[in-house]
Amino acid sequence: MEYLKYTPEMARDWKNAISASEGYLRKRVLDSMNESQLVSKMWLVEELSNLNVKPVNISLLAGWFAQYIVPLLYDNFESIEWIENFEMDRDIKSLAYKFNTRYKKEDKYKVSIKNVMFDNLVSLSSPTFDTVINCSCEHM
């Protein structure tokens, strides 16, 4: 995994997300777009590939804005049908959708506001998750 595919669709979505962020939320968006965030997500995707994992329905725990991980996963695993980002920070939801507009429009991505430490993540409408990715294990 050497790069993130920066497509015209991604450029549009990211511009809209960053333009929509204001004040403290803009600072948080910019903080989320650092080298270590991208490198760690690229490493994760590469390791999943090395293990020959073929994810279909992914539960993303504490995915924050998910601007790197969601496109990296979809671009590298044709098997993926669904990614659900479980995040407790209510402020990120609209911007996470802006970053990932194309996946939301295709009904392939959802943000659910949940505390992954205490809330039940599975509901009757949830798919059966075959892959769980914890993006914030150092905080739990």
Language-model-detected regions and their locations in the chain:
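Class I SAM-dependent methyltransferase Rossmann-like catalytic core
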Residues: 1-55
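Structural motif
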Residues: 33, 61-64, 87-88, 134-137
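Well-ordered, non-membrane alpha-helical segments in soluble/globular domains
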Residues: 36-46, 69-73, 97, 140
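Conserved class I S-adenosyl-L-methionine
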Residues: 52-67
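Conserved SAM-binding loop of SAM-dependent methyltransferases across substrates and taxa
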Residues: 65-79
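Conserved SAM-binding motif I beta-strand of class I
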Residues: 79-88
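S-adenosyl-L-methionine
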Residues: 88-131
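A short SAM/SAH-binding and catalytic strip from SAM-dependent methyltransferases
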Residues: 128-140
